[in-house]
């Protein structure tokens, strides 16, 4: 498994955008109705087997909401998990846990889902074949999606148009004759 690291700055800025998307303009109006804000402990438990990914995004999501939240990772990024595996334990004020839980779970689900699916293809293809991803990613999620492919054992192709030349059918068709 290749060692992949995303910068802390990238993870932080991505989590800030995600939280802003969820909380703008008025915050979590439902959680704000709760009177209780006691310290609580929550376990993140896998609901199926697969490859876990996105732990640093989940951790940073809670850290941005409350620096006092403890996020204890129980499984390594890129490791196999089974249904019922404890992935992480979160301890902190319940309101902040509730505010961040959906954003954190979305990162975990998306990255783990891609890594798990990629891993299935990699196993099926065998050692002599590389499973590569393309640039056909959701805008602004390319780095995360390609990261997930690597976690699953896949290979990244081009990240952008300047990485290498790629001549596809469009360039060899009549449409290309119109371009100087």
Residue positions per predicted region:
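Single conserved hydrophobic/aromatic residue that forms the stacking wall/gate
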Residues: 174-180
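Acidic/glycine-rich phosphate/pyrophosphate-binding loops and surrounding catalytic core
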Residues: 2-173
């Amino acid at each position: 498994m290749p060692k992949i690291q995303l910068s802390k700055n990238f993870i932080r800025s991505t989590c800030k955008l995600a939280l802003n998307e969820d909380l703008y303009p008025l915050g979590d109006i439902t959680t704000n109705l709760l009177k209780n804000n006691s310290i609580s402990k929550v376990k993140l438990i896998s609901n199926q087997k697969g490859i876990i990914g996105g732990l640093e995004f989940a951790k940073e999501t809670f850290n941005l909401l409350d620096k006092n939240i403890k996020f204890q990772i129980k499984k390594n990024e890129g490791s196999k998990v089974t249904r019922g595996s404890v992935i992480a334990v979160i301890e902190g004020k319940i309101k902040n846990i509730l505010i961040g839980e959906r954003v954190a779970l979305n990162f975990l689900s998306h990255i783990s889902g891609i890594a798990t699916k990629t891993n299935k293809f990699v196993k099926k293809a065998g050692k002599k074949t590389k499973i590569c991803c393309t640039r056909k990613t959701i805008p602004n999620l390319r780095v995360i999606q390609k990261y997930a492919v690597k976690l699953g054992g896949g290979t990244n192709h081009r990240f952008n148009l300047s990485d290498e030349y790629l001549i596809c059918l469009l360039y060899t068709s009549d449409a290309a004759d119109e371009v100087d």
